[in-house]
């Protein structure tokens, strides 16, 4: 949720953010109008309430002649106070609802535009020139006995799969390597619940424009998470953290679930776009003044992991119109996929500033003793999709795949060889 005080002081900043996102600027004027009306209604309620208390005290001291008039006024004030309170509460609810519908204010130097207007920050490595026609990850996965989408569909439906044999070992190796790296960098490992309450899902900003992506269990009124960012953000809801505890860094390992609504016909082959996958996610509570630098650190840790799996990748600065509701700035790392001849996202890291903490009421105690909202940040350190990039970039002509050196202790093999299909 955006900062109402900051909006009053600099409404043009939100207008510029809305323009950059391609969103409606008029919401700024509606917010200011509602805020003004709410404050006026609140002032009227407080004035009437003060008068009501004063009249109540005066009745006991009044003469017989004065008492009747005071009692009549007290009766009238009771009705007026009730009406004024109801008006103030209604305007407060309307203002809060509108505030919660507005996306985070983007950083001023974020690229302007939509999904195709990202800026390439850097390209790392050179896409390999094959002297044979490279196979895609699904063909390789089937040859290696690593991926079984046919039985996944039989058991669960489209966009489900089994990781089998070396496929399971590759994923476990990736996730374990990511956890090891994160712990070495000062993160506390967490295995969070994957079902959360509505207030937690909404507090992180995933029940707005992303609501169609989320699995809901109506009988229990719980939501399946699409990322461990959600439970990790809710972990300190309604708490005040000591300033000297910041940054507080968590690394979460969880299964993730996404409906992939609106993606009909996209990435139907293989395991690039699926309903269930595993992910290791970094999540940080930081001092707002240090959030920008912390964001760059998260990006650097993502890049270290990508360097370890030895695939060509690029870093892109996502345009404002393609940012999620909660993000003020986002960087993606995209790996080269030989079978598609293009880069595909493997990681993302977002600076959500105080947007989520304001919705979840997460604060820190500043040096002056006053509670202030923390900044929250997140970043992917490994996920199932990385297997796609590893198989395709490290494949050999016979269908074998060279295992990146960093993963060999986990997989137990230097090279994965095709097996006879069962």
Swiss-Prot record:
Entry's EC annotation: 6.1.1.11
The main place the protein resides is cytoplasm
Give the record's keywords alphabetically. Aminoacyl-tRNA synthetase, ATP-binding, Cytoplasm, Ligase, Nucleotide-binding, Protein biosynthesis
Q: Where does L-serine bind?
A: 227-229, 281, 380
- One of the record's GO cellular component terms: cytoplasm
The reaction(s) annotated as catalysed by this protein in its Swiss-Prot or TrEMBL entry are:
tRNA(Ser) + L-serine + ATP = L-seryl-tRNA(Ser) + AMP + diphosphate + H(+); tRNA(Sec) + L-serine + ATP = L-seryl-tRNA(Sec) + AMP + diphosphate + H(+)
CDD domains noted in UniProt: SerRS_core
User: Example GO molecular function term?
Assistant: ATP binding
Report the Pfam families cross-referenced here: Seryl_tRNA_N, tRNA-synt_2b
GO biological process: one example: seryl-tRNA aminoacylation
Subcellular compartments: Cytoplasm
Which pathway does the UniProt entry assign to this protein? Answer: Aminoacyl-tRNA biosynthesis; selenocysteinyl-tRNA(Sec) biosynthesis; L-seryl-tRNA(Sec) from L-serine and tRNA(Sec): step 1/1
- Residues that bind ATP, according to the entry? 258-260, 274, 345-348
| Family per record | Belongs to the class-II aminoacyl-tRNA synthetase family. Type-1 seryl-tRNA synthetase subfamily.
Q: What is known of its domains?
A: Consists of two distinct domains, a catalytic core and a N-terminal extension that is involved in tRNA binding.
Report the function annotation for this chain: Catalyzes the attachment of serine to tRNA(Ser). Is also able to aminoacylate tRNA(Sec) with serine, to form the misacylated tRNA L-seryl-tRNA(Sec), which will be further converted into selenocysteinyl-tRNA(Sec).
PANTHER family found in the cross-reference section: SERYL-TRNA SYNTHETASE
Q: How does it assemble?
A: Homodimer. The tRNA molecule binds across the dimer.
Q: What name goes with this protein?
A: Serine--tRNA ligase
Species the sequence originates in: Thermobifida fusca (strain YX)
């Amino acid at each position: 949720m955006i900062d109402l005080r900051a909006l009053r002081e600099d409404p043009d900043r939100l207008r510029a953010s809305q323009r950059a996102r391609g969103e409606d600027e008029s919401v700024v004027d509606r917010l200011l109008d509602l805020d003004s009306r709410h404050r006026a209604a609140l002032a009227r309620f407080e004035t009437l309430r003060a008068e009501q208390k004063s009249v109540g005290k005066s009745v006991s001291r009044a003469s017989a002649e004065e008492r009747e008039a005071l009692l009549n006024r007290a009766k009238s004030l009771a009705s007026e106070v009730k009406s004024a309170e109801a008006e103030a509460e209604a305007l407060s609810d309307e203002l809060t609802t509108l505030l919660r519908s507005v996306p985070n204010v983007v950083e001023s130097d974020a690229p302007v535009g939509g999904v195709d207007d990202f800026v390439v920050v850097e390209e790392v490595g050179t896409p390999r020139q094959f002297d044979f026609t490279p196979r895609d990850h699904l063909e390789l996965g089937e040859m290696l006995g690593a991926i079984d989408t046919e039985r996944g569909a039989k058991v669960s439906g489209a966009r489900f799969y089994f990781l089998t044999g070396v496929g399971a070992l590759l994923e476990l190796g990736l996730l374990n390597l990511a956890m090891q790296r994160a712990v070495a960098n000062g993160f506390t490992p967490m295995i969070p619940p994957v079902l959360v309450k509505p207030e937690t899902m909404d507090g992180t900003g995933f029940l707005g424009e992303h609501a169609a992506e989320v699995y809901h269990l109506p009988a229990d009124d719980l939501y399946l998470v699409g990322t461990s960012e959600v439970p990790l953000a809710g972990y300190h809801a309604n708490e005040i953290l000591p300033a000297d505890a910041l940054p507080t860094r968590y690394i979460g390992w969880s299964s993730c679930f996404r409906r992939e609504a609106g993606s009909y016909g996209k990435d139907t082959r293989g395991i690039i776009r699926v309903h269930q996958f595993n992910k290791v996610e970094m999540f940080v509570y930081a001092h707002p003044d240090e959030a920008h630098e912390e964001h760059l650190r998260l990006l650097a840790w993502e890049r270290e992991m990508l360097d370890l799996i030895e695939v060509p990748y690029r870093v892109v600065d996502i345009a404002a119109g393609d940012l999620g509701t909660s993000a003020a700035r986002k960087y993606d790392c995209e790996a080269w996929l030989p079978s598609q001849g293009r880069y595909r996202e493997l990681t993302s890291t977002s600076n959500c500033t105080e947007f989520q903490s304001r919705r979840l009421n997460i604060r820190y105690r500043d040096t002056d003793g006053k509670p202030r909202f923390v900044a929250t940040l997140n970043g992917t350190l490994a996920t199932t999709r990385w297997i796609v990039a590893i198989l395709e970039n490290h494949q050999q002509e016979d269908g074998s795949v060279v295992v990146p050196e960093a993963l060999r202790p986990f997989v137990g093999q230097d090279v994965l060889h095709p097996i006879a299909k069962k």
